[in-house]
């Protein structure tokens, strides 16, 4: 019995593991609050590929979610251009997300249908060093979000931006696709791109060039369809085509004024020359008003009822007055009609002939006698023979 159990145990474990099923790998990452976090999902780190197989030729897709939840946390996004391109997890954590989060990623090989899992342990913490109070957001229309997430394009953007900003350390704070900000999907013609928002922070103040771009005069020129004011050389061109009408500057070094909470008072208004409080109302007796409101309609209704009763009971013409006002010829004609009617009724009542019984077929209308049928109707067939 023990030998049979030892024989079936490895087989059962293999069935539960499934084809291609392996234990999920675990990787620890350290995102920083307020800084962009980018993690590349490569097929080689998930699937056990043969040595001669090139990772770029194997279609692989990914599915990522927060452990114990069906989707990713709010600050984290996933994107992949196609199964032949790597996937990216990117975003910027907020102070509320500080702590430990576990992201479970499953890779699917679209050729062999193999799957592999990986757990990403994110230990989110605060960044070290001085804060970055000066923040600028650019809209780059010449790139998609997948083209800016790798380290090389991001470093090239910071290097090119250093020519427009005063010397200082620049940090990427966030990268967002223009589609996530309400942008439209471009047409697949002319190499059009979706666009990407890149947010950069620095401890150095804004340069004069950036302040001029974000000035009200530049916004007015953009509203008229004209290019904004740019007093310096565009070092981002031609590799990065920036929409200078969509540049926003945020200075967090100046604290925002806190809204004062209104203090509840005692409900008594202070002395105000324009406010005239109402005088005290004297007590009034509403008994007379109530009596007038109720008794006057009742008296009017009573008078109308008495007038109607007098007209109906005391002002009737009477039968005698009606007969006197009627002519004699009309009265004779009327009486004749009544007398003739009574005479006809008496004659009809004195007839000895019984009332006709129309349902009986043997009844004689002229004599009124009842005769038995000559033929026994019970012996007559319903349908006569046809000769």
UniProtKB/Swiss-Prot annotation:
Span of the signal peptide: 1-24
Major localization class: membrane
Modified-residue entries (Phosphoserine), positions: 377
Topological domain ranges for the Extracellular compartment: 25-290
Key words of the record: Cell membrane, Cytoplasm, Cytoskeleton, Glycoprotein, Membrane, Phosphoprotein, Signal, Transmembrane, Transmembrane helix
Claim: Cell membrane is one of the keywords in the record: yes
Cellular component terms (Gene Ontology): cytoplasm; cytoskeleton; sarcoglycan complex; sarcolemma
TM spans (from-to): 291-311
Residues carrying sugar: 174, 246
Annotated S-S bridges: none
Pfam families: Sarcoglycan_2, Sarcoglycan_2_C
Membrane topology: Single-pass type I membrane protein
Topological domains, Cytoplasmic: 312-387
GO molecular function: calcium ion binding
InterPro entries membership: Cadg, Cadherin-like_sf, Sarcoglycan_alpha/epsilon, Sarcoglycan_C, Sarcoglycan_N
Cell membrane among keywords: yes
Location of this chain's protein in the cell: Cell membrane, Sarcolemma; Cytoplasm, Cytoskeleton
Functional note: Component of the sarcoglycan complex, a subcomplex of the dystrophin-glycoprotein complex which forms a link between the F-actin cytoskeleton and the extracellular matrix.
Complex and partners: Cross-link to form 2 major subcomplexes: one consisting of SGCB, SGCD and SGCG and the other consisting of SGCB and SGCD. The association between SGCB and SGCG is particularly strong while SGCA is loosely associated with the other sarcoglycans. Interacts with the syntrophin SNTA1.
Similarity-based family: Belongs to the sarcoglycan alpha/epsilon family.
Record's protein name: Alpha-sarcoglycan
Organism: Oryctolagus cuniculus (Rabbit)
Lineage, highest ranks first: Eukaryota, Metazoa, Chordata, Craniata, Vertebrata
